[in-house]
């Protein structure tokens, strides 16, 4: 599926399914008998806040949580259904977790991400033993000298980097007809909900891994839909930050005007936590200066349980026809939003907006060629 076409035709359905919690179960999700329990820690749908509570109480440690995720990756990403969402594991993840546990025992907790495992897309530089290849065999052997700026911010916040996720090669700019979730280095990533269906891209690995609970949180990158499309397909919360809120330094580029990394998580609250942790002014990326005085380190303060009250939400009428199961789920989601105070407005096909897709992608191609 072309992710731009998906954005036009599929994202509202994804929002609806997520809103009512009725998305089909991912491989190993609650109620599934597909995976064998190997740990007392239930990672399915667990939040940052819940993990922090377990570490604070001493029930778990960053090391035990990290090991639990690594075992889950072994069971369903590298075996079983072989989701193939992770292109490389970090050999230093346990030692990182040990250091963060030591800090906690000494009374230092950096913040809500202290000791929390994370996966990042393989076009984001990490100054460690892992490669940064954008999924391409052409870059095999490429080790970054230092972290991307946003990776530095996240490490400073206390994350445990589990590894790197697969992607549509070169962030889906390998060709004008590339395949979502496939790279020459990593192979084809699968959707954890329906193994033979498209996981969308280009942040396919982050979407699949997040949906399968292979990490507490994930990071993707987006030029034109590469965070929000796989997030929607995989029932995640994806945010494309305003360009400049997160630095682009150290991320393999496509467009100087549209590229950015962004959060991909299981919940809105976790996305807000991750969004704040990644912000910061970077001297090497002048556009981040635009965020001075406009950004914050804690976006959770803007979360409101009654946030839909008084809001008008438009839904194209075309989404209310077709597959009866999907239509039923979407209408149920519409009802939930209405009970939360939103007004649902059914609108005709927004043809003028859809016409923007072609010139936009041409502009991205121009950006890519001009560097």
PLM features: residue spans?
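N-terminal secretory signal peptides and thylakoid transit peptides that target proteins
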Residues: 1-14
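Gly/Ser-rich catalytic/binding loops embedded in alpha/beta enzyme cores
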Residues: 16-19, 33-224, 242, 335, ...
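C-terminal segment of classical bacterial N-terminal signal peptides
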Residues: 20-25
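A short helix-breaking turn/cap at a secondary-structure junction
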Residues: 28-29, 34, 240-333, 351-354
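Acyltransferase
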Residues: 66-67, 98, 298, 322-350, ...
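Short helix-loop capping/hinge segments that flank enzyme active sites or metal/cofactor-binding pockets
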Residues: 114-134, 297-316, 365-371
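Charged, often glycine-rich, active-site loop that binds/positions anionic groups
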Residues: 133, 176, 180-183, 356-371
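Structural signature of FAD isoalloxazine-binding scaffolds in flavoprotein oxidoreductases
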Residues: 228-233
């Amino acid at each position: 599926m072309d992710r731009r076409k998906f954005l036009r035709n599929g994202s509202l359905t994804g929002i609806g399914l997520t809103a009512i919690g009725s998305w089909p179960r991912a491989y190993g999700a609650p109620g599934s008998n597909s995976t064998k329990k190997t740990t007392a820690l239930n990672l399915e749908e667990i939040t940052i806040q819940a993990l922090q509570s377990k570490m604070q109480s001493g029930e778990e440690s960053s090391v035990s949580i990290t090991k639990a995720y690594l075992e889950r990756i072994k069971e369903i990403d590298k075996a079983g259904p072989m989701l193939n969402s992770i292109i490389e594991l970090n050999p230093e993840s346990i030692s990182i977790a040990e250091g963060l546990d030591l800090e906690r025992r000494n009374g230092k907790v950096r913040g809500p991400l202290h000791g929390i495992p994370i996966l990042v897309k393989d076009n984001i530089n990490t100054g460690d033993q892992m490669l940064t290849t954008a999924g391409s065999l052409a870059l095999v052997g490429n080790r970054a000298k230092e972290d991307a700026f946003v990776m530095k911010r996240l490490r400073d916040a206390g994350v445990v980097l589990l590894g790197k996720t697969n992607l549509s090669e070169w962030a889906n700019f390998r060709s004008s007809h590339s395949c979502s979730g496939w790279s020459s280095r990593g192979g084809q990533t699968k959707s954890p909900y329906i193994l033979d269906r498209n996981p969308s891209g280009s942040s396919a690995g982050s979407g699949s891994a997040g949906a399968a609970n292979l990490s507490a949180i994930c990071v993707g990158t987006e030029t034109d839909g590469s965070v929000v499309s796989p997030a929607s397909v995989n029932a995640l919360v994806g945010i494309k930050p305003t360009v400049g809120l997160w630095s682009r330094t150290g991320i393999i580029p496509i467009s100087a005007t549209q590229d950015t990394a962004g959060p991909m998580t299981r919940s809105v609250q976790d996305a807000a936590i991750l969004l704040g942790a990644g912000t910061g002014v970077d001297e090497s990326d002048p556009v981040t200066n635009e965020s001075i005085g406009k950004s914050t380190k804690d976006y959770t303060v803007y979360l409101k349980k009654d946030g839909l009250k008084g809001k008008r939400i438009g839904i194209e009428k075309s989404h209310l026809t077709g597959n009866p199961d999907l239509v039923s789920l979407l209408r149920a989601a519409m009802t939930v939003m209405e009970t939360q105070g939103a007004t649902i407005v059914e609108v005709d096909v927004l043809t003028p907006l859809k016409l923007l897709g072609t010139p936009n992608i041409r502009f991205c191609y121009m950006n890519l060629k001009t560097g």
